[in-house]
């Protein structure tokens, strides 16, 4: 994996630490995964949870991203998704499956 994904790897590390075994998979997608990001592009990161995400889960994921924003100036856009939905035929999930980079 290219070293320029280190911010995404750090986000994954923090998410796993905060979610106590509920993380099934973390995938970078969007412009950073495709390799066509600009310097100010955000980091689109899908967090697949073993159960249904709650509003508190989204708050926690956002807080972890905000911490990295303050530390690095880079914005993480988290997307919590139940892992049972990974194979669904939606535009977002098809994009994650086709262009995503598992972390």
Regions found by a protein language model. Name each.
Residues 1-25, 34-39, 49-103:
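Catalytic core of pol beta-like nucleotidyltransferases
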Residues 31:
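Conserved H-loop
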Residues 44-46:
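Short, well-ordered beta-strand segments
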């Amino acid at each position: 994996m290219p070293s320029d994904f280190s911010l995404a790897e750090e986000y994954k590390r923090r998410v796993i630490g905060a979610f106590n075994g509920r993380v099934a998979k973390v995938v970078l997608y969007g412009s950073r995964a495709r390799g066509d990001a600009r310097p100010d592009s955000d980091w689109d990161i899908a967090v697949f949870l073993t159960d249904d995400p709650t509003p508190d889960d989204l708050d926690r994921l956002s807080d972890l991203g905000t911490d990295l924003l303050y530390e690095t100036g880079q914005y993480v856009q988290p997307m919590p998704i139940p892992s049972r939905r990974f194979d669904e035929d939606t535009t977002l999930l098809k994009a994650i499956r086709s262009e995503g980079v598992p972390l």
